[in-house]
């Protein structure tokens, strides 16, 4: 068993994630921070990078925004220290979220830790998509945007449970969804972060 597999086995799904890329509906921009790149050991050399895993998922989704994001990732010669992925208004569904979640699940712990900010705002992912996403997001994520995603109490509950264990989370935007007042109040009780519900 590789070192990464051993580490993943010891962590829950809520503590295994970390990533970041930024793409908008009409345009996209890759936001990176400079950092020192270190070569992985031989056990990790066959694993896909975060960018490679995401390219596969984005091409399978096939929307204009997803394809543009995949093209931009393909042109990136070097992985950055941090990645912000914003796929707003990308016409994504719960099925598309499964592709993104699978890409995250295929990525090593060290690669996932690079995800900083993630947004699927204004995509009709619903409860199913929100629940799928909650099971794959890294606990190191600092910002999450799920505005106007047709999320009800079931999906909201899954995101809320993930957020309780996401020790890196500093801001969550989940307004304009179909959650009950009671669920909104539960989000309001999250501490040490900005919550927009």
What are these regions (language model features)?
Residues 1-14, 28:
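N-terminal secretory signal peptides
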Residues 14-20:
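N-terminal export leaders
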Residues 20-197:
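Leucine-rich tandem repeat or coiled-coil scaffolds
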């Amino acid at each position: 068993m590789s070192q990464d597999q051993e580490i993943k086995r010891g962590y829950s799904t809520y503590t295994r994630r970390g990533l970041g890329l930024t793409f908008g509906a009409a345009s996209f921009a890759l936001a990176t921070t400079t950092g020192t790149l270190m070569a992985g050991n031989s056990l990790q050399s066959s694993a896909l990078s975060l960018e490679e895993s995401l390219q596969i998922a984005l091409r399978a989704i096939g929307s204009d925004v997803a394809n543009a994001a995949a093209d931009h990732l393909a042109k990136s010669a070097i992985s950055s220290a941090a990645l912000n992925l914003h796929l707003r208004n990308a016409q994504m569904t719960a099925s598309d979220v499964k592709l993104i979640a699978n890409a995250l699940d295929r990525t090593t712990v060290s690669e996932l830790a690079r995800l900083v900010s993630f947004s699927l705002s204004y995509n009709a992912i619903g409860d199913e998509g929100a629940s799928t996403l909650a099971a794959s997001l890294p606990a190191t994520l600092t910002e999450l945007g799920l505005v106007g995603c047709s999320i009800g109490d079931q999906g909201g509950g899954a995101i809320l449970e993930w957020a309780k264990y996401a020790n890196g989370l500093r801001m969550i935007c989940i307004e304009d969804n179909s959650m009950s007042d009671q669920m909104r109040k539960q989000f309001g009780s999250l501490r040490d972060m900005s919550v927009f519900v």
